[in-house]
């Protein structure tokens, strides 16, 4: 045993108490294997065994932490990319200003009424690099919401429009609609980015965007408790998935979601013939549809 080159090398790098354990195990294994006259030396076999154990321990430690994902839907660096659709979906409650935004982002016929829409309005958005993307304005009525799962499954990004002048009164409804969008399986699995656009900033009664975010987070936190972990509407009743919004045991925050949720404000309608403050929307589309 003293002539073993392998054990002598181990003695240089390992503490004495570890070497005592190795010598003890060595003698046990050597005594056990001696009758079999194996062509492999005991110290080589012992080294191979220790190496195998070491590899298993390392793979368990780094493999489990590397593949760990938040059970609650938080972002992780090794998440598998899922191909998204190509549509830009404009969503929100009725009278939020969705159609006005569509008109000012696309080449849609300006004759389209900006009053409450009954059916979807469609157009084409042209990016800075001349890429043409379908853009869909989805009415806020219940009938249109029934077709929303299909629209979301084909979406590259979502613009959720809020009427900043009525948000305080409608905050619960806004949160309910947003909850259904964020817990939609396609939005969740494909990590479809969302921009919450606080519209009508040209009017004095518009609420501040930071307040909108804080109120929505509180409302969504309440909805998690009352509605559980499954979406209830949007045509998903027959195919419910266990999707929990945010991190369990902590107050809801948009930062806890797997997909990027941004906030911006502005006015979707032209003022004195000029369109104001929708550059954030254009930048959002540009960066999320590359």
Curated annotation (Swiss-Prot):
Entry-linked Gene3D superfamilies: P-loop containing nucleotide triphosphate hydrolases
Keyword Metal-binding: no
Signal peptide: none
Molecular function (Gene Ontology), one example: GTP binding
Main location, first listed in the record: endoplasmic reticulum
Keyword Phosphoprotein belongs to the record: no
GO biological process: protein targeting to ER
Cellular compartment(s): Endoplasmic reticulum membrane
Ligand binding (GTP): 92-100, 114-117, 140, 268
GO CC aspect terms: signal recognition particle receptor complex
SUPFAM superfamilies: P-loop containing nucleoside triphosphate hydrolases
Summary of subunit composition and partner proteins: Heterodimer of an alpha and a beta chain.
Function: Component of the signal recognition particle (SRP) complex receptor (SR). Ensures, in conjunction with the SRP complex, the correct targeting of the nascent secretory proteins to the endoplasmic reticulum membrane system. May mediate the membrane association of SR.
Full protein name: Signal recognition particle receptor subunit beta
Organism: Dictyostelium discoideum (Social amoeba)
Gene name as annotated: srprb
């Amino acid at each position: 045993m003293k002539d073993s080159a392998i054990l002598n090398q181990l003695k240089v790098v390992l503490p004495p108490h570890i070497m005592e354990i190795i010598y003890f195990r060595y003698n046990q294994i050597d005594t056990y294997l001696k009758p079999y006259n194996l062509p492999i030396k005991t110290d080589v076999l012992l080294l191979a065994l220790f190496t195998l154990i070491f590899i298993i321990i390392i793979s368990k430690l780094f493999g489990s932490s590397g593949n760990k994902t938040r059970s609650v839907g938080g972002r992780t660096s090794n998440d598998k990319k899922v191909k998204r659709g190509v549509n830009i979906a404009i969503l929100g409650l009725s009278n939020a200003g969705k159609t006005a935004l569509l008109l000012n982002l696309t080449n849609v016929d300006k004759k389209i009424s900006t009053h409450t829409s009954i059916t979807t309005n469609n157009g084409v958005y042209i990016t800075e690099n001349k890429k043409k993307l379908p853009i869909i304005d989805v009415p806020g009525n219940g009938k249109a919401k029934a077709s929303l799962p299909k629209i979301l499954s084909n979406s590259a990004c979502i613009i959720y429009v809020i009427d900043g002048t009525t948000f305080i009164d409608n905050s619960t409804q806004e949160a309910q609609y947003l909850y259904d969008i964020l817990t939609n399986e396609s939005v969740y699995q494909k990590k479809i980015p969302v921009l919450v656009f606080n519209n009508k900033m040209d009017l004095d009664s518009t609420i501040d965007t930071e307040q909108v975010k804080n109120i929505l987070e509180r409302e969504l936190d309440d909805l998690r408790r009352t509605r559980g972990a499954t979406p209830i509407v949007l045509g998903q009743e027959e195919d419910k998935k266990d999707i929990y919004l945010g991190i369990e045991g902590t107050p809801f925050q948009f930062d806890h979601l797997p997909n990027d949720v941004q906030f911006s404000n502005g006015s979707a309608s032209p003022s004195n013939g000029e369109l104001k403050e929708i550059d954030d929307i254009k930048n959002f589309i540009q960066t999320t549809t590359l």
